[in-house]
Amino acid sequence: IERFANSDLTIIEGAGGLCSPLARDGYNIDLIRKVKVPTVLVAKDEIGVINNVILSLSMLQKYKIKVLAIVLNRKVSSQPDGMNNYQEIKSLTKVPLIQILNKKEDNDREFKKLIKIILV
């Protein structure tokens, strides 16, 4: 971790969520707290994501970790009628929200928006 301290940009990817074990002695959230860097919260756009995002934002806020953006990733095509996770989450938070559709879609605009948020 120390060797990245003077880097212009370092991306560390966690997996499984903030409370997922990273090692025997810590979780993803512990690493984020240790490196003291802003975070991009990534969540799969499916049923249950609103709960996951709100709980994760609450935990990040509790530990005073800045959230640069929320990325809704890999939108599931078979969602119930009327379900719009993007709009619902957007109404619940002021954190910038990015929606990345599946691999077949053109996501260039959203990726550029995310890069701009990260680099500012």
Explain the meaning of each model-derived region.
Residues 23-30, 54-57, 82-87:
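Charged helix-capping and loop-helix junction motifs
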Residues 17-18, 46-47, 74-78:
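Short histidine/acidic/glycine/proline-rich micro-motifs that form metal-
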